[in-house]
Amino acid sequence: MKQVQVAVVGASGYTGQELLRILLNHRGVKLVCATSRQYAGQPLWEVFPRFRQVPGSGLKFTDSDVEAIAATGAEVAFLALPHGVAASYARGLVDRGVRVIDLSADFRLDSPDVYEEYYGNPHPDTALMQEAVYGLPEWRREEIARARIVASPGCYPTSILLPLIPLFRAGMLEPEDVVACSGSGVSGAGRKASIPLLFCECNESFHAYGVPKHRHLSEIEQELSHAAGETVVMSFTPHLIPVNTGICSTITAKVKKGADPESVGRLLEEAYAAAPFVRLLGRNQPADTKNVTRTNCVDIGWAYDPRTNRVILMSAEDNVVKGAGGQAVQSFNIMCGFDETEGLWVL
């Protein structure tokens, strides 16, 4: 098997750690660069002892700029950086011939105005923003394969878009009557030290946040509007739940007049028959985060409530795997001509 030289930029957070875990076990990857200002000079295994004696884990973190990253010979770079920071690295790397998979929000949106509305600053590179491909592999395989830059979707959007896109594409759902409630593990808030994220603050606690306009709402509405061919407006309420990883989303949507709610199962099956990481549980089968932990899978169940004429969709994923690092590697596989599942069947 050919090997692609890979860099992970911003490799010391939870998403970066997950990328390293997957890439160190990927037969088609030669890891040539991992950056971290905090841990520069230390080998991967010393910072993350779980990697001790794993081949490749002796690579040392560096505090590298764009030029130094490109000089390592990296052909593909994963950016696990905060929004606003990632864009400057992306432009420099793409201009040097390095293909980029960005896990921040910098290139997920089509509109610079929407980006500024949700993220509070003007977009730093609108030209590259227009070029970027939204990297939801189940729906963008051909575009991902050709892309110079892929914007890997957010964790919440992945759990909501995959159940809804087939139904909106079929014209089944009302575009202004969608409600999603999601719960995410604490790792979704990142690895930084923060009082609200301390164990005694999070444990035995369950609460909403980011109400009423969480940043991920922007990309969810954007992609659902593309699928529906009309503007979709929805209500989205995320919650913090006291687990390390996992997202569980419950989505309800009103069925359009004349549409057949009994076709939900068929539409999902047709959409994901060739999708290795989408597991359809069937009617009246709720998804459970414990069944997707440490996997790149999304489990989806569904139901119909005739009293309210609403479809109920239930999904579960691991927020740092399918919701972040795993999905990014899935796009990498497509970009580089590997089997889509390479390195990702770790259960």
Curated annotation (Swiss-Prot):
Known EC number: 1.2.1.38
Q: What is its main location?
A: cytoplasm
Statement: the UniProt record of this protein carries the keyword Lipid biosynthesis = no
Q: Known Pfam families for this protein?
A: Semialdhyde_dh, Semialdhyde_dhC_1
Positions of the catalytic residues: 155
* Keyword check for NADP: yes
Known InterPro entries for this protein? AGPR_AS, AGPR_type-1, NAD(P)-bd_dom_sf, NAGSA_dehydrogenase, Semialdehyde_DH_NAD-bd
Pathways involved: Amino-acid biosynthesis; L-arginine biosynthesis; N(2)-acetyl-L-ornithine from L-glutamate: step 3/4
Domain of life according to the entry: Bacteria
The entry lists its GO molecular-function terms as: N-acetyl-gamma-glutamyl-phosphate reductase activity; NAD binding; NADP+ binding
Q: Which UniProt keywords apply?
A: Amino-acid biosynthesis, Arginine biosynthesis, Cytoplasm, NADP, Oxidoreductase
Q: Name the top EC class.
A: oxidoreductase
Q: Which GO terms describe its cellular component?
A: cytoplasm
Q: Where in the cell is it found?
A: Cytoplasm
What reaction(s) does this enzyme catalyze?
N-acetyl-L-glutamate 5-semialdehyde + phosphate + NADP(+) = N-acetyl-L-glutamyl 5-phosphate + NADPH + H(+)
Q: Name one GO biological process term.
A: L-arginine biosynthetic process
Return the similarity comment.
Belongs to the NAGSA dehydrogenase family. Type 1 subfamily.
Give the function comment from the record. Catalyzes the NADPH-dependent reduction of N-acetyl-5-glutamyl phosphate to yield N-acetyl-L-glutamate 5-semialdehyde.
Q: By what name is this protein known? A: N-acetyl-gamma-glutamyl-phosphate reductase
Q: Which gene encodes it?
A: argC
